[in-house]
């Protein structure tokens, strides 16, 4: 007979059963998926000072991470990282880009760069609002 359990201490193996099951179903649903990783870095003397990463898939750029070292912020590097990711995504045939942030200030920056809010979730975590934004990449 099946038996339920609820735990704070699930094993890596138990969690792997869940994640692999979800991924297997997702891959089956997205049989025509064409995911390709994408990353952009700016280095100074060999150290990464800014960059972004994500993937292109289903005619969309999904930006997962965008980061600028604290001492290099507010001088346009974040905008440049996004521009470079978007340019490569266009070459790959992406029609739009999706990005998320928990920062109201960063959401305002993305808005100035042409991103439009598609969803906001107030009090998402710790009082922060989750901003989900999309930008058309077609000319």
Regions from the PLM with identified roles:
Residues 1-10, 139:
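Conserved N-terminal entry element of GNAT/NAT acetyltransferase domains
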Residues 18, 110, 115:
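Conserved active-site tyrosine of GNAT-family acetyltransferases
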Residues 35-50:
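Conserved beta-hairpin
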Residues 47-55, 60-67:
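Conserved beta-strand in the GNAT
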Residues 74-87, 112:
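Conserved acetyl-CoA-binding loop-helix of GNAT-fold acetyltransferases
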Residues 78, 82, 103-106, 123-129:
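Short glycine/proline-centered loop/turn elements that form peptide/ligand docking sites
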Residues 89-102:
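Conserved GNAT acetyl-CoA-binding A-motif
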Residues 98-100, 116-134:
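Conserved catalytic-core motifs of GNAT/GCN5-like acyltransferases
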């Amino acid at each position: 007979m099946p038996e339920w359990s609820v735990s704070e201490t699930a094993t890596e193996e138990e969690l792997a059963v869940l994640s692999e099951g979800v991924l297997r179903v997702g891959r089956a649903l997205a049989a025509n998926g064409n995911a390709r990783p994408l990353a952009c870095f700016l280095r100074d003397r060999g150290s990464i000072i800014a960059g972004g990463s994500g993937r292109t898939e289903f005619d969309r750029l999904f930006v997962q991470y965008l980061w600028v070292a604290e001492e290099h912020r507010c001088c346009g590097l974040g905008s440049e990282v996004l521009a470079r990711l978007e340019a490569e995504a266009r070459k790959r045939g992406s029609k739009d880009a999706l990005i998320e942030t928990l920062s109201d200030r960063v959401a305002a920056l993305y808005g100035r760069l042409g991103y439009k809010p598609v969803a906001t979730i107030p009090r998402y975590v710790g009082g922060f609002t989750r901003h989900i934004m999309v930008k058309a990449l077609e000319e």
